[in-house]
């Protein structure tokens, strides 16, 4: 995107130029349309789009990788489907309704390892069996944080 294009979008009365303070910032995102199981990923520096919902961390107590792990957990998928929105869309206002528990440092460390393992597997082999095992580890960890037995 060129400087002239950005200037046009900022000044043209027909342009819908919103949220530009978040342009070219890393964060987390997910597709607007999903199945029962939500899938969230790290968002590279880019311009936001309505079909890929984006969020940005505001505090180190709840880092982006932690929120990504929560959204990717089976618990949050079931929570959203049963209590927030049982349609095929998961939008920003739905995400705002997620119950976020501030984790301990040990819990953050554990989820950071799971997060990094997921990226490594996706980049290297995309092995379905390894990913399934990692999903089970993630689910057990999130269930423990939320005191689900």
Please give the residue ranges for each predicted region.
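Polybasic, glycine- and aromatic-enriched phosphate-binding surface used to engage nucleic acids
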Residues: 1-109
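Non-catalytic DNA-recognition/assembly elements of restriction-modification systems
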Residues: 102-149
């Amino acid at each position: 995107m060129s400087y002239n294009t950005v200037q046009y979008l900022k000044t043209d009365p027909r342009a819908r130029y919103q949220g530009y303070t978040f342009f070219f910032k890393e964060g987390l995102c997910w597709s607007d349309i999903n199945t029962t199981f939500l899938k969230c990923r790290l968002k590279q520096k880019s311009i936001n789009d309505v079909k890929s919902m984006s969020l940005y961390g505001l505090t180190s107590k709840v880092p982006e990788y932690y929120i990504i792990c929560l959204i990717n957990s089976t618990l949050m998928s079931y929570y959203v489907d049963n209590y927030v929105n049982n349609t095929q869309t998961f939008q920003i206002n739905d995400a705002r309704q997620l119950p976020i528990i501030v984790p301990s440092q040990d819990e953050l460390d554990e989820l950071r390892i799971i997060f990094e393992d997921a990226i490594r597997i996706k980049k290297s082999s995309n092995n379905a069996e390894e990913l399934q095992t990692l999903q089970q580890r993630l689910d057990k960890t999130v269930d423990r944080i939320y005191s689900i037995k």
